[in-house]
């Protein structure tokens, strides 16, 4: 299986990526991979923007949260509404 990665709004523009899939084996180190590890692998080392947010399987998550094979990770900037 793979980890699905999606980018939204300015993060999509900055990375030039809409979505991709990464083999879980490519990012798992010492048995644990985090959302931040997924960002690093997906963007080939681009710095993670300080205000970036993420969701794992459509639930808000911390960037240090563990990810598993088959998860969907979304990265997006902070948003506000009115």
In which residue ranges do the predicted regions lie?
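Ubiquitin-like/PB1-type beta-grasp interaction modules and other compact soluble beta-rich domains
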Residues: 1-81
């Amino acid at each position: 299986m793979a980890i699905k990665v999606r980018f939204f709004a300015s993060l999509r523009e900055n990375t030039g990526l809409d979505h991709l899939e990464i083999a879980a084996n490519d990012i798992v180190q010492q048995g644990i991979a985090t959302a931040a590890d997924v960002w690093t692998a997906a963007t080939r080392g681009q710095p993670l923007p300080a205000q970036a947010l993420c969701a794992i399987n459509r639930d808000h998550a911390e960037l240090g949260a563990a990810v598993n094979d088959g998860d969907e990770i979304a990265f997006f900037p902070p948003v506000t509404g009115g």
